[in-house]
């Protein structure tokens, strides 16, 4: 699929950001004994404060630590995408970062515009995934929109080998669709 197909959809045009948010190797997270050592590595830097990228809250941090290094790196990149998409659309408002089923979850609690997105690893494949409420039509819509450009797990998840390259734009659109799900549902 061409890049244009990823950016012009029913969900609107989205910015094309190719920044790599986490330059640090996350294998070092396990050897850090002190939370104060970990926070600067995952977003509590001046550069990310300028971008409005919040650090991973201390109560959420253990959920990321339970994943393998490669999975954690992909999931943290997806986390940044979620915040980037939310900041690019003023209708979404601020996000609440919480634990759901022991995994990081992102809710539009302020404006209630969207459906919860949860980050985790799909059990069968072992791939990092964006999990969506299975009672929504989100994943079916992604299948229709992106076809084989993305991998799916039933009606609940988009599987992610890597959050870079051409799938980056598709993933951003999936995130935007989830975070604005209730806006479209009302119209």
Region roles according to the model:
Residues 29-187:
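Charge-dense, helix-prone N-terminal extensions
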Residues 1-2, 15, 60, 74:
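Non-transmembrane, interaction-prone segments in cytosolic or luminal domains
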Residues 2-3, 7-36, 40:
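Cationic, amphipathic, low-complexity segments that mediate targeting or membrane/lipid association
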